[in-house]
Amino acid sequence: MSLVVSQQAVTSQRLNAELINKLQTLIQFKSVTPNQAGAIDWLVMQLCELGFCCEKFTSSGVTNLIAHIKFNEGPCVAFSGHIDVVPADNGDWLTPPFDGRIINGVIYGRGAADMKGGVAAMLTATKKLINSTSSKAGTFYWLITSDEEGEAEFGSAQIANKLSSNGIVLDGCIVGEPTSSTHVGDTIKNGRRGALSARILVKGRAGHVAYPQNTINAAHISAKIVNKLSEQAWHLDDAGSKTTLQVTGINIDNVVDNLVPSHCEITFNIRYSHRYSSEKIKSILNNSLDEFSRYITINWERPCEPYYTQPKSKWSLITCVEQAIHSQTGNYPVLSTSGGTSDGRFFANSHTQVIECGLRNNTIHQVNEHVSIDDLIKVEAIYYDLLSRIYIER
């Protein structure tokens, strides 16, 4: 083995050890939404050491970070991530959920996959980029929040607003969500469906079940409404982005069996194609349920608009991500818009291309959430390859 190859191997081992240590450190911050628990403070220290300008700000108890470093003139691209996690009690965990312990080459801990693993991998890739002696062009932003797993009102939405008010326009945004399925890099998100919830209050007239002619049965009306909702057609869908409507509750406050119910509440959630907007969805369903209008009141809740990124003819973030993944894995990823909503929606617009790319999502939010060290190293390699394609002048 030559001296150069030997030195490269030693450097690689050292960086891999740093990567593992970074993830363990992040896991040990008990940053349950919206508490950053010191995780963002630690990131500020790490990024400042790499030469980033860092701005930390709070909004309604949420901590956010905007950090950037400017090279020569070139593309303006961001990494968007979150350090908050869903709750975890010791319960059935193999190890305490905030220890970051390694068992048989696997790192266990809340947030290991969603998404502290992605943050640790991008931090290591960022350090490699900064330390590279190659000429670089562009501006690199880090956009981190402690409010992604909750209502997401005061996290990335506020970061996007602050960027806009400062006249900062991103060419691209890489979101480090765990998008992979069977193998790291097998799936990336080039969009997300929108989401919209609703409550329908159905009002009838109560009475004795033996005299139905004197009543208006709210349950019977509700059954017809549920049937109407379940049969709704969505003509604008395309193959890669399907709209689905799921009834999530039918509730009647009735404690006896001889009383026709006067009220019923129906709840439902729609995950809708990027071909629609929330206002279009509301209009379609209001028209569909118009025949029941004298009996119902609809309250719409928690709208999340969809986004969709297509390949561009000039500079294309999709192409950069696809090439980085192919270079590191030998395969091209599947493009998908499936799954839940993400913070990508806050940064996507007609100019900003948003792509989500990260670890496997098979254990997220579960007891014994984990990531293998091999997967962690692989996603870091993809990230560094991607950053090199974006920033290193060729």
Language model features: what each stretch is:
Residues 3, 14, 178-183, 190, ...:
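Metal-dependent amide/peptide-bond hydrolase catalytic core
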Residues 75-79, 143, 172-174, 353-357:
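Hydrophobic/aromatic beta-strand patches that form the interior of the parallel beta-sheet core
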Residues 76-141:
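Active-site metal-coordination/substrate-binding segment of hydrolases
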Residues 88-102, 170, 174, 191-201, ...:
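Acidic-glycine-rich active-site phosphate/pyrophosphate-binding loop
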Residues 107, 117-126, 130-228, 368-378:
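Fold-level recognition of mixed alpha/beta catalytic cores in primary-metabolism enzymes, strongest
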